[in-house]
């Protein structure tokens, strides 16, 4: 009997903890709160119509935090540009229903479209299609090629053809990328390319200060 009571108490505590961690962010409830959002910039190839504070890819990491008064907190894709990020303390997975699993927070007065893809390994990609909205929710369960229960660590956003806005915030401006349907973290490889990309960001920052 005591064992049964302990089991019930433990189960109740777990349910309370999960419910307590659910956090409304940008008007959308993320069950896992802050850890739901992308943590790592894998690659960033901006178009020519991006400059100033809008070409910092790390601005797309973490929870949405764009500050319109100082125009900081978002990164622009630019014409033909792309951004690839990864989840390191969680992953994106299916939900088993028609609700949005992946949410992309895009900012600005213009609602600009972009292509969204996901991957388990940063090599083989599944196209989720062209989307737009502020923010945009995508039901990955409805996408051909997405496997039930698969854990996706990578998200790639690519500008769609056509000029949607100009310098310095060309095309879609990304504030955050979050997984509502969040699975456990998957260990990611650390290829040399990641290190070289990080070095490139450091050199870019140094050159701006001169």
Descriptions of predicted regions:
Residues 1-8, 191-192:
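Bacterial N-terminal signal peptides that target proteins for export
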Residues 10-14, 200:
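Hydrophobic helical h-region of N-terminal Sec-dependent signal peptides
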Residues 17-18:
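N-terminal signal peptide c-region/cleavage motif recognized by signal peptidases
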Residues 23-118, 122-185:
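A domain-level signal for the mature, folded cores of soluble proteins
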Residues 189-207:
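A short, hydrophobic C-terminal helix/tail in secreted or cell-surface proteins
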